[in-house]
Design a protein with these regions (language model features):
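A short helix->loop->beta-strand "cap" motif at the edges of active sites that frequently abuts
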Residues: 92-96
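Conserved TIR/SEFIR loop-to-helix hotspot centered on a Trp-containing motif
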Residues: 77-88
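Short acidic-hydrophobic, aromatic-tinged amphipathic segments that line or gate anion-handling sites
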Residues: 115-130
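Catalytic donor nucleotide-activated moiety binding site of glycosyltransferases and closely related
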Residues: 23-52
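Short Lys/Arg-rich basic patches
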Residues: 134-154, 159-163
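TIR-domain catalytic/interaction hotspot
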Residues: 44-70, 81
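Short, basic amphipathic alpha-helical segments that act as recognition/interaction helices
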Residues: 165-185
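Short, glycine/polar-rich helix-capping loops at beta-to-alpha or helix-loop-helix junctions
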Residues: 102-111
Length: 185
């Protein structure tokens, strides 16, 4: 599968290790990752580009997103450019995994009602499982995506279990259901 990866170029000085971990995790799952435009670019390079160079790059960026199977955006460091790329991917109906490692989820995206947009807090312990779940969703190997509302008390419990067992909340819930299915056969 072809994946378009994006993240803040300015935030790279603080989060490069996280960016590389995400890219390597995607590659380990046999994904072709488009990421050089983030990893190999600098703020000063971008400022030095001419208008024509910026327009040419923008056309290339649109092509990469259009040709990708899905997008992964690391959004811990806020970026209007990353937000624009996410909006473009949404317009093209691409599945998008928004990742953030600290703080709150991106406020304009986390509460957006779009089943193709998934926003997850991650750590290196659960990153691989989160990406596996998302790839399975994109491939359609999951029967369906099921979204439901839970109380704050349940959300708090899920967060605690997720951290202590170092697994995504969705994996924990799936295991509970699978155990119950076996018990009730």
């Amino acid at each position: 599968m072809k994946v378009y990866f994006t993240a803040s170029i300015v935030g790279k000085k603080h989060h490069l290790g996280d960016y590389l971990k995400i890219i390597e995790t995607l590659k380990s799952k046999n994904c072709e990752v488009i990421s050089d435009h983030i990893i190999n670019s600098s703020e000063s390079q971008i400022r030095m580009e001419t208008r024509e160079e910026r327009l040419k790059f923008h056309r290339q960026l649109e092509k990469w997103i259009r040709e990708s199977d899905f997008m992964v955006a690391e959004t811990t460091f806020p970026s209007i450019s990353v937000g624009y790329e996410i909006s473009l991917a949404q317009h093209l109906l691409k599945p998008i995994l928004i990742l953030y490692s600290t703080g709150s989820p991106p406020s304009l995206l986390a509460h957006h009602k779009d089943e193709k947009l998934v926003c997850e807090k991650y750590s290196s312990d659960i990153l691989s499982d989160l990406i596996d779940d998302f790839i399975n969703y994109v491939k359609g190997t999951n029967d369906s995506r099921f979204t439901f509302f839970i109380t704050a008390k349940i959300a708090s419990f899920l967060e605690k279990v997720s951290k202590s067992e170092k697994i995504p909340k969705s994996v924990y819930l799936r295991k509970l259901i699978e155990q119950d299915m076996q018990y009730k056969r």
